[in-house]
């Protein structure tokens, strides 16, 4: 029984000038992933990981806080320009995009990649409040 050594896993610093920000905003949460051009994840964050729980995860403010966090992580890797792909019907779409622009990124293009079914799966039942 030798002495257990704890190995510190250090994140390697990549120098990537441009990337793609994938903003997925559902009715319950907003996740933001920044990848390089090949799709390898550089940094990610979500409203849930920022400490918001329950119905507060779906607010625009929670999406803004998550976008500021992921922007800080991506700028540590030297990222300057972004293409933004927005998906989903949630309320955090625009606020996450505005937070990425305010963080100092140059946004070259904004694409809406929300999937639209051609009469696929049956939708969930209507809410009666």
Swiss-Prot record:
Keyword line: Ribonucleoprotein, Ribosomal protein, RNA-binding, rRNA-binding
Gene Ontology CC terms: ribonucleoprotein complex; ribosome
Domain of life according to the entry: Bacteria
GO aspect biological process, one term: translation
SUPFAM superfamilies in the record: Translational machinery components
Gene3D superfamilies for the chain: Ribosomal protein S11
Cited function: Located on the platform of the 30S subunit, it bridges several disparate RNA helices of the 16S rRNA. Forms part of the Shine-Dalgarno cleft in the 70S ribosome.
Family as reported in the entry's similarity comment: Belongs to the universal ribosomal protein uS11 family.
PANTHER family per UniProt: 40S RIBOSOMAL PROTEIN S14/30S RIBOSOMAL PROTEIN S11 (PTHR11759)
Descriptive protein name: Small ribosomal subunit protein uS11
Organism: Rhodopseudomonas palustris (strain BisB5)
Lineage: Bacteria, Pseudomonadati, Pseudomonadota, Alphaproteobacteria, Hyphomicrobiales
